[in-house]
A protein has these predicted regions:
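A short beta-strand-turn-helix
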Residues: 23-41, 71
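Non-catalytic, surface beta->alpha helical segment in thiol-disulfide oxidoreductase systems
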Residues: 97-137
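Sec-dependent N-terminal signal peptides
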Residues: 4-13
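Thiol-based oxidoreductase modules, predominantly thioredoxin-like and allied folds used
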Residues: 22-26, 62-86
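Conserved redox-active cysteine motifs that mediate thiol-disulfide chemistry
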Residues: 46-62
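Sec/Tat signal peptide C-region and signal peptidase I cleavage site
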Residues: 14-19
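Hydrophobic beta-strand anchors of alpha/beta hydrolase catalytic cores
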Residues: 43-44, 77, 102
């Protein structure tokens, strides 16, 4: 019984500490519908499993509580592997030659901003804040 309580306490404690970005893996249409219903923008992460900068962003930026809270309040976030169909199509349409690539859309599908490459959390957040502020000024 003590072992079970310890394991539950440990599991709950580590889960609470990880307020990271919640990424959807649904279709782009489903993600857009979620954003419409929730009144949020759409954030898309185009990555590849073999990409060191992509993995660095996952470990050092998207895992942070402050980044997770900021993004979850403002975006429905989705991620697509550029080695698979949806990711490849998005990269072809909106991309450059480099990943990671981050795209921000409004609920009408208009591209509001693009962030290319890895960055530390503060720089990444500054870039997102700029995109969000520009969108707010349009309204």
């Amino acid at each position: 019984m003590k072992k079970l309580l310890f394991l539950l306490t440990f599991a709950l404690g580590t889960g609470a500490a990880q307020a990271q970005v919640k990424f959807e893996t649904k279709s782009t249409d489903a993600v857009r519908e979620m954003a419409i219903k929730q009144g949020k923008l759409v954030f898309i992460d185009l990555y590849a499993s073999w990409c060191p900068p992509c993995r660095m962003m996952e470990r050092q930026v998207f895992s942070r509580k402050d980044v997770g809270e900021f993004m979850d309040q403002r975006f429905v976030a989705a991620k697509y592997d550029t080695d698979k169909t949806t990711g490849r199509e998005l990269m072809k349409r909106y991309g450059r030659d480099a990943i990671p690539l981050y795209l921000v859309f409004d609920t009408e599908g208009e591209l509001l901003g693009r962030i290319t490459g890895a960055a530390d959390a503060e720089t990444f957040m500054d870039n997102l804040r700029t995109i969000v502020a520009r969108q707010a000024q349009k309204k």
